[in-house]
Amino acid sequence: MSQEKYIMAIDQGTTSSRAIIFNQKGEKVSSSQKEFPQIFPHAGWVEHNANQIWNSVQSVIAGAFIESSIKPSQIEAIGITNQRETTVVWDKKTGVPIYNAIVWQSRQTAPIAEQLKEDGHTKMIHEKTGLVIDAYFSATKIRWILDHVPGAQERAEKGELLFGTIDTWLVWKLTDGAVHVTDYSNAARTMLYNIKDLTWDDEILELLNIPKDMLPEVKSNSEIYGKTAAFHFYGGEVPISGMAGDQQAALFGQLAFEPGMVKNTYGTGSFIIMNTGDEMQLSSNNLLTTIGYGIGGKVHYALEGSIFIAGSAIQWLRDGLKMIETSPESEQFALASTSDDEVYVVPAFTGLGAPYWDSNARGSVFGLTRGTSKEDFVKATLQSIAYQVRDVIDTMQVDSGIDIQQLRVDGGAAMNNMLMQFQADILGIDIARAKNLETTALGAAFLAGLAVGYWEDMDALKELNATGQLFKASMNESRKEKLYKGWKRAVKATQVFTQEEDADDDAK
């Protein structure tokens, strides 16, 4: 009797690594998770030890096998999904990183980004990469490492150093240094990749003095990149055949294969990605243009809007204000509110993300009266998440010219039924919650399985992650627009408040 076969997804995140084993129905059979240390050398700096990431991945691979009694020989293929933009530079011969991994959130390279803007490169970089110039992306992180590690620039020019985002690092380690590759979605977040020509951009590389030899080969999101070295996969030589950055993997896991399909992951922040098809559309409203995925020689582009504060606003109610004891309680409190939704919370704790990109804005509250209750405040905080999502969705519709009919949702806060119903109401469209909320890992598994024939084609996947619950808009148009106008006024007032402060500082 032949053994049943499975797909393993390695989900390497910002604070932890996970390995999840899926069966042919797309069901989770086993999983293992391990956190690893965050390193904060200075205020605003965030780093990881790349070897600790690798150790955590080895640990969770073992954990997933132990929990399920599945053997390495039963794994048909491996898919990898990862925290995007985080940058590792290592010695080609020894495989030892020359510096910590600089994490996507880290602001230590902001002066390099500011210099690029001052030197007038914003338009050129936006047109080629689809991105805004920011320390968020990998390019400035590579430049920082080459500047700050003695002899690094010279070694890079001699071909002695390699660069990779976390997907690249893990494939390099799993194959014991045999394969140095990345995929379209991760390359598109480096600020070095020309997403129109699908090549590393020589002009940007020259501008930043980054040797091209350091960079990995860019591959599609679904093909066999190499096989695991047996001693790194508990005796198994298994194809690694799917890769995508976490948000793009979620787009694929949500089966958003057609232009105009949109997914939103409600995590700590909120990441909204729209499939725009095979045409690259540059945003004129501060959204990012990126690559959603590329399979079989065809690339699907995407528009992305990032909201800084979503689920973390609920954590603030719990840990900061002590208004609730657990995050799920926020739903009960909000449903108990009897207010007419006149309170607005603008959770700009670290500034405002898309489409405002106002890093100076700070959190504010409007519309309080003597009768405002704790329940009203909790409801207003939940509603702020939905209002921010509408800001991005409206912008996406303008940029793309596509009329969005449905929003596919996943992530922790998507379990809040009150929030999902209000989201449907304020957008005036259906909200489809994924039945399987493991959409990021599932997307990586789908990409890997397609490449080895575990699933026949993309049509076969459509049966596997059916919609869980559908939330339909039920609010009348005039009330919906009245509430949203109030939100826009609150955001404007928030921005004016910090602008006035800046003006006062300048006057001094």
Curated annotation (Swiss-Prot):
Alphabetized GO MF terms: ATP binding; glycerol kinase activity
SUPFAM superfamilies: Actin-like ATPase domain (SSF53067)
Residues holding ADP: 14, 18, 268, 311, 412, 416
Alphabetized UniProt keyword annotations: ATP-binding, Glycerol metabolism, Kinase, Nucleotide-binding, Phosphoprotein, Transferase
Activity: how regulated: Activated by phosphorylation and inhibited by fructose 1,6-bisphosphate (FBP).
Residues modified to Phosphohistidine: 232
Superkingdom as given in the UniProt entry: Bacteria
EC category: transferase
GO biological process, one term: glycerol-3-phosphate metabolic process
CDD domains hit by this protein: FGGY_EcGK_like (cd07786)
Known pathway: Polyol metabolism; glycerol degradation via glycerol kinase pathway; sn-glycerol 3-phosphate from glycerol: step 1/1
EC number assigned by the record: 2.7.1.30
PTM per Swiss-Prot/TrEMBL: The phosphoenolpyruvate-dependent sugar phosphotransferase system (PTS), including enzyme I, and histidine-containing protein (HPr) are required for the phosphorylation, which leads to the activation of the enzyme.
Reaction(s) this enzyme catalyzes, per UniProt: glycerol + ATP = sn-glycerol 3-phosphate + ADP + H(+)
Sequence similarity: Belongs to the FGGY kinase family.
Assembly and interaction partners: Homotetramer and homodimer (in equilibrium).
NCBIfam families: glycerol_kin, PRK00047.1
Protein's recorded name: Glycerol kinase
Organism: Streptococcus pyogenes serotype M4 (strain MGAS10750)
Gene that produces this protein: glpK
